[in-house]
Amino acid sequence: MVRVAHFYAYSHVQEVRKLNRGTAVSFAPTVSFRNAERIYLGSGTHIGEGSVIWAGNSTSRVILGEKCLLAPNVTITASNYGIVEGTPVMDQPKIEKDIVIGPGVWLGANVVVTAGVTIGAGAIVGAGAVVTRDLPANCIAGGVPARVIGHRPAAPGEQAPTVPAAAFDRAVAP
C-alpha cells in the first residue's frame, strides 16, 4: 500500500498540477508524468491506463496536439542516456530532444516513442510499435522500429483527412 501511495503521489498527483493542458483532457489515474511543466496536452486528448509520459530533466518537451488518443501502456520519453564505452550508463549525461505528436494521432497499446521524434497529424501507430524516427501525417505505421505501412483512406467522395495546421500550432506554442 505504501508503494502504491508513493507512486501515485510522486508520478501522478504532484506532476498533474504542473501539466500544461487544454480543455477536456482525460487520463487514467495510473498514468505516470515526469517533469510535467514541460508536457503540453492538446484539448480533447485521452491517455490510457499505465501510460508513461516523461519530459526531459532540463530542456526537452513532450507536446501532444488536440484530440490525440493514447491506448494503455504507451511510453513517451524525451530523454535517453548516453552510451559511450567505458562509463556506466547511469553515470552518462542524458541526451534530451523534444517529442512532438500532431493533432488527431492514435497510438496503439504498448507503443514506445523515443526522444527527438515528430509524428504528423492524424497518424496511426499500431500496437507494440517502437517509434525511433519521424512519421508523416495521416500515415499508418507499425513494427520495431516503426515504419510506414500504409496511409489513412479518404472517406468515400472526400479527400484524405487532414487536421488544420492552426490546431497543431496551438498545441506547440509553449
What kind of feature is each model-predicted range?
Residues M1-R17, G22-T23, K67, N80-V84, ...:
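Terminal amphipathic alpha-helical/low-complexity segments used for targeting or macromolecular assembly
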Residues A9, S32-L41, H46-V117, V144, ...:
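Flexible, glycine/small-residue-enriched loop-and-beta-strand segment within the central core
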Residues S60, A137-C139, R147:
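Glycine-centered loop/turn positions within well-structured domains
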Residues A109-I124, A129-R133:
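Beta-rich strand-turn-strand
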